[in-house]
Amino acid sequence: MFCEKPTEKREKSPCRCKNCVLRHSDFLPWPEPIGFTSDRKTDKDNNNHISTLQSVESVVTISDVNERHTTNHYKNHQSNPDEIAYTPNRSGVSSPVNDGASSPTQRGGTTPAPQGGKGGNSPSRVTAQPQAQPTILLIVVNKNDPPPYGQGQSWEYPGQQYSVPGPRGYPGPGPRGYPGPGPRGYPGRGPRGYPGPGPRGYPGQGPRRYSCPGPRGYPGPGSSGRPDPGGGLQGYYYPPSGPGNGTGPSGRPRPQNENEYAYYDRRRYSEAYQNNRNDWRGQPRGYYDGAYAEEHNLNRQPETRRNCQCPEKQQTPPPEETQNAQENDDQQTTKRKSFKRLVGMGVGNTCSCQGPSLMGSNLRSLGNEMDNQEVGRSGNMGTPPNTMEYLSERGSPPEIREVTVTDAKNKTYKCIQVPICISTGKANTCRCCKCAPSPDAENDESFDEDAECICNHEGKCTCVAGNEFPTEFGCECDLTNLEQTLRELIPNAECICYLKKKKRRRKRKKWAPKVYYDRFAGPPFVLNPKPRCLDYGRSPFCNPCYNPCSCAPFAKSCYTCDYNCEGCGRF
């Protein structure tokens, strides 16, 4: 039987994993990747915030230890030429170095030489050098605009050059101690404390609010904020007008609506505005809530008239002036004043009259004619015409119209203007008043005891004889105060809301003392108020007290009836 040759056992390659258990201590671990090393270093720096930088002594100590470790490594592994040596460095990343070859740092790379091998007999000493870190190059480009008055030219003295430019590209000081231009193209200060040019080459504001000369011979803004020709307000820089009509400072076209945004109102120079109320500059202003504004910027609203009267189409001719008529006029004036006092002046906005105001004119003319007829007749008793019939002859009353009224609190009311008898309903449902017999005996034949009467415009009954009474009679209600006020207010729309809310009667609970219970007693009993035993007559506890106070008929407490006698002796 043939024996097979024993298989040669392959030599296990030494494990160089850093955390492997089978790795011998003599074998150095594999180097970690550069990116992973930098991440670990970053984590380590984040964990140790206090010690961020290593001192010089620690660096020297680490370098000495690395040199000693490298020397020992070459002494131990000199017999094995194929073994790769690893040189630690300060950065914590070890780079592989072949024996007898130049170091990777000297070649500029981190990988061993491909032809490394048995080139040399004695290893050369490799110095530990820090690995090159990546460099981030940040380039900042500053674009310097050209100065507004020429490169190197002085603003005050054109033609004279400035001195040598300053460091880092900044302009140096001007000649004779004058300040140079500002940094990065901005204009500097002017000479002798005067301000320099403004932005974009326009003149700045002078000292003590005096104007500075504008560029190219144009005048600058005036002093104290008043605009000079071509200037503007204080604190603002107005560019001068261009050479041509309709162009701006740089030859740009002006906007078409530029006149709308002008500072002053050109209409104030017209003759139509001379008689108006102007301010100290002669410029009309609109006043609104204590502040004023320009008239062309604020739409002026008409002034609110509190008691406006709607225009009447037909005005009755005034009656003949008599003494009684003057008295009636005085009475009507007094009534109007009282009604205005009732309505309240100064409350509410303007009224908007809708529809014709025939009703108010008819009622006023009707009242005047009735007064004249009463005055013309003998005595105070007159026969006024029927109101409904009179209105039917003159024309049907206008339709009901609504007028919206807003008071000072912006609360809106709708006042409905209607004819009389609004409180009782229609006119034919009103009850007519009866007249008493006439005191004059001469007029007994012509006077009817069953004579009826109507109410005049003042709400008073006026007796009418039977013969003179109209055949078709429609009764008219007695005017209440509300109806008189409404009649006087028609067509004036400033009304008062007479509708009052009904007050709900508040039901008052009967007073009873608050009851406190002893909830922990069994059964719970009342603590306050204490229950009283109305025990009238002789008390059963009189004899032991020998005190007549307990024998009186009074309310006693069931709990303290034994102690109702103060200071009484007991057996």
Swiss-Prot record:
Biased composition annotated in UniProt, kind: Pro residues: 168-184
Biased composition (Gly residues): 217-234
Annotated region described as Disordered, given as residue ranges: 71-128, 142-258, 298-336
Bias-annotated ranges (Polar residues): 88-113
Extent of Low complexity compositional bias: 205-215, 311-326
Protein's recorded name: Uncharacterized protein CG42266
Organism: Drosophila melanogaster (Fruit fly)
